From Swiss-Prot:
SUPFAM superfamilies recorded: RING/U-box, WWE domain
Name under which the protein is recorded: E3 ubiquitin-protein ligase RNF146
Cross-link (Glycyl lysine isopeptide (Lys-Gly) (interchain with G-Cter in ubiquitin)): K86, K96, K132, K177
Biased segments, Polar residues type: 217-235, 306-324
PANTHER family: E3 UBIQUITIN-PROTEIN LIGASE RNF146
GO cellular component entries: cytosol; nucleoplasm; plasma membrane
Swiss-Prot/TrEMBL catalytic activity: S-ubiquitinyl-[E2 ubiquitin-conjugating enzyme]-L-cysteine + [acceptor protein]-L-lysine = [E2 ubiquitin-conjugating enzyme]-L-cysteine + N(6)-ubiquitinyl-[acceptor protein]-L-lysine
Region described as Disordered: 197-243, 261-359
Length: 359
């Protein structure tokens, strides 16, 4: 049994090619597994990327497929929207090695605010055509056929000649954005995105507009002002209005009980009669004084009400019943005649507070 086992082992070894040994076959098959083939271009992958479904393709092949259907070419699973911006590279070191290049020169195509380096396969095709003196050559990029015009140094799609992009042959060490649409550094990615947006003027304009709006909002608001410790509305009156208001307050303070009573009536308050009164008002004199001073006193009362309306309403529906209640109060007094009555007068001070005075 042991000899049979050895014979089988020897037979399996003899099945290998004569120019290779078992150790050599194992060492040679390992690297071949690290270079997958692309099911789209049917060639070895250039900058292979892995989709969420674990299928591997060339980055440019996935880019072309996403333009057409945004689905995997094998299982039809959807490709994420941000996959082209953040692809899953199988060998990031290969990308950096490709940016350094193998020779002295490399081929580039024009991008926004910079140049992109062609992938290794396309660069070899361009260099071969250039060295042979060809005027143009065709390239398969992202599933589309492009024509490289080596005389005018432009490239365009074979079925769309209107859109042209500059190309050039330059040294390998020039500043570049990346290789075949893949950026070399994440930090550079952020900087370049900001510069591209600012070059268009969209982000810069929106940023300036946002700043102007933020600056305009606080300038339109004013702090609350105070009159004798009481807050008033944010709208500040003119200097003339402030002077007239102060004069009216001083006039109200110097006036007697008759002025306070008339201001009380002007606000729509009703008189409260009491049998224990000690004064008989002279209605004829009061009516004459009220008629003479109504024009001078009603104005400051209205101004004071307007300045304190937003903070504290004094008496509701006062302006609607001024004339009616004034006439009614005069009638009640004339009917009372020489009788005795007591009036509780509530006058308003300049600071907005009310006091009750017995007469």
């Amino acid at each position: 049994m042991e000899m049979a086992g050895c014979g089988e082992i020897d037979h399996s070894i003899n099945m290998l090619p004569t120019n290779k040994k078992a150790n050599e076959s194992c060492s040679n098959t390992a690297p071949s597994l690290t270079v997958p083939e692309c099911a789209i271009c049917l060639q070895t992958c250039v900058h292979p990327v892995s989709l969420p479904c674990k299928h591997v393709f060339c980055y440019l092949c996935v880019k072309g497929a996403s333009w057409l259907g945004k689905r995997c070419a094998l299982c039809r699973q959807e490709i994420p929207e941000d996959f082209l911006d953040k692809p899953t590279l199988l060998s990031p070191e290969e990308l950096k090695a490709a940016s350094r290049g193998n020779g002295e020169y490399a081929w580039y195509y024009e991008g926004r605010n910079g140049w992109w380096q062609y992938d290794e396969r396309t660069s070899r095709e361009l260099e071969d055509a250039f060295s042979k003196g060809k005027k143009n050559t065709e390239m398969l990029i992202a599933g589309f056929l492009y024509v490289a015009d080596l005389e005018n140094m432009v490239q365009y799609r074979r079925n769309e000649h209107g859109r042209r992009r500059k190309i050039k042959r330059d040294i390998i060490d020039i500043p570049k954005k990346g290789v075949a649409g893949l950026r070399l550094d994440c930090d550079t990615n952020t900087v370049n995105l900001a510069r591209e947006s600012s070059a268009d003027g969209a982000d810069s304009g929106s940023a300036q507009t946002g700043a102007s709006v933020q600056l305009a909002v606080p300038s339109s608001t004013r702090p609350l002002t105070s009159v004798d410790g009481q807050l008033t509305s944010p709208v500040t009156p003119s200097p003339d209005a402030g002077i007239s208001l102060e004069d009216s307050f001083a006039h109200l303070q110097l006036s007697g009980d008759s002025i306070a009573e008339r201001s009380h009536r002007g606000e729509g308050e009703e008189d409260h009669e009491s049998p224990s009164s000690g004064r008989v008002p002279d209605t004829s004199v009061e009516e004459t004084e009220s008629d003479a001073s109504s024009d001078s006193e009603d104005a400051p009362v209205v101004v004071a009400q307007h300045s304190l309306t937003q903070q504290r309403p004094l008496v509701p529906n006062g302006n609607q019943t001024v004339a009616d209640q004034s006439d009614r109060s005069g009638t009640d007094r004339s009917v009372a005649g020489g009788g005795t009555m007591s009036v509780n007068v509530r006058s308003r001070r300049p600071d907005g507070q009310c006091t009750v005075t017995e007469v």
